């Protein structure tokens, strides 16, 4: 997951950036996750990769702030796609976690690109609130998520056909 979610975007950016800098206006969009701002039990490697991607996008946005390259970061919550295997779908159902249709995420991407130069956008309620709270009061989020830990562990032990996006 680190290679796909973090190393590949960094390497691709390194190759594309000289071309993008030749234009008056260009954009880089990094698609992260709510889990790039909130460490979630059962998804340590995935969260680490998305935390890294968010940090990379934030740093690059600041480094390129005096250029024509706009750096954006989109953080969807769970999205209903084929990338989610049965374990993730079942876990989300058990936790009552909403899963957005890809068209919702696409709409959020368009809104991100229409917004301020170089910005972040978090998708979904209450996830976007949790991201903000986690930034200033992480222990509060720890307490809120602690009640879900037994469910996460139960699903981690069950046998489901695995997918590459799952822990």
Segments predicted by a language model, with ranges:
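Active-site loop immediately N-terminal to the catalytic Tyr-X3-Lys motif
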Residues: 40-44
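C-terminal helical subdomain
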Residues: 73, 93-131
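Active-site helix of classical SDR
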Residues: 13, 49
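A hydrophobic alpha-helix adjacent to the NAD(P)-binding/active-site core of NAD(P)-dependent oxidoreductases
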Residues: 1-2
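Residue(s) in the substrate-gating loop at a strand-loop-helix junction
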Residues: 33
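Alpha-helical segment proximal to the catalytic Tyr-Lys
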Residues: 18, 62-63
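A short helix-coil junction within the Rossmann-fold of NAD(P)-dependent oxidoreductases
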Residues: 15-24
């Amino acid at each position: 997951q680190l290679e796909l979610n973090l190393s590949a975007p960094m390497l691709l950016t390194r190759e594309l950036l000289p071309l993008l800098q030749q234009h008056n206006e260009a954009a880089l969009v990094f698609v992260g996750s709510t889990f790039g701002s909130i460490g979630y039990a059962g998804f340590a490697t995935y969260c680490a990769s998305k935390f890294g991607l968010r940090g990379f996008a934030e740093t690059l946005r600041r480094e390129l702030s005096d250029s024509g390259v706009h750096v954006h970061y989109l953080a969807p919550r769970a999205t209903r796609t084929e990338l989610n295997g049965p374990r993730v779908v079942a876990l989300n159902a058990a936790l009552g976690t909403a899963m957005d249709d890809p068209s919702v995420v696409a709409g959020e991407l368009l809104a991100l690109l229409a917004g301020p130069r170089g910005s972040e956008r978090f998708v979904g309620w209450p996830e976007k609130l949790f991201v903000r709270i986690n930034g200033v009061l992480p222990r509060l989020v720890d307490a809120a998520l602690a009640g879900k830990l037994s469910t996460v562990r139960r699903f981690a032990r069950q046998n489901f056909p695995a997918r590459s996006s799952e822990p």
